A protein has these predicted regions:
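Short His-Asn-centered micro-motif
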Residues: 55-57, 91-94, 115-119
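Hydrophobic "anchor" residues on beta-strands that sit immediately upstream
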Residues: 52, 88, 113
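N-terminal accessory regions of nucleic-acid-interacting proteins
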Residues: 1-53, 57, 61, 96, ...
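Short, basic, glycine/proline-bearing loop/turn elements
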Residues: 17-28, 82-92, 140
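Short, well-ordered alpha-helical microsegments
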Residues: 61-62, 99-100, 122-124
Length: 148
């Protein structure tokens, strides 16, 4: 049996407690990321609504004091979750097969508003691997979500 890290992609149908159904796509593969981004673009292009995406980032664990660490040893993105409507891409980026330029282009696209909570740390961590979010909308910074 292959380890879960070696698994390139899987798609799941998930029903929330509210009865809403979601499609969750888990991957570390750039081909799956590209296909999911194309799906998002088709969704955007078939709608007159603003292009809005939910964004969350999980990091690798750092056990030592950050002050003592070299840049290469600091926290890095482990998983990036990107959601449009009822489709969520869970990109295990720390185990990505190759760098996905399409993903870099997507998250820096100024047409897309990326909704986040407490984006300050996410911005720093994403920047460590050259990812820049073009139009973040931080719910906490705009006081739409409490900081406590």
């Amino acid at each position: 049996m292959a380890s879960q890290i070696s698994m390139v992609a899987a798609e799941y149908q998930v029903r929330a407690i509210t009865g809403d159904e979601f499609i969750v796509i888990y991957t570390r593969g750039s081909a799956t990321v590209k296909a999911c981004l194309a799906r998002f673009l088709r969704m955007f292009n078939s709608s007159t609504d603003e292009w809005v995406v939910g964004l969350d980032v999980e990091y690798t664990t750092v056990l030592e004091s950050k002050k003592l660490l070299k840049e290469a040893e600091k926290k890095k993105p482990a998983m990036i979750q990107v959601c449009v409507h009822n489709v969520c891409l869970v990109y295990h980026i720390c185990h990505a097969d190759i760098e996905c330029q399409d993903f870099k282009n997507f998250i820096k696209d100024e047409r897309v508003k990326f909704v986040t909570v407490d984006f300050r740390n996410d911005r720093d961590v994403l920047g460590r691997i050259g990812l820049v979010v073009g139009q973040p909308f931080d719910l906490q910074k705009t006081s739409l979500v409490s900081s406590s």
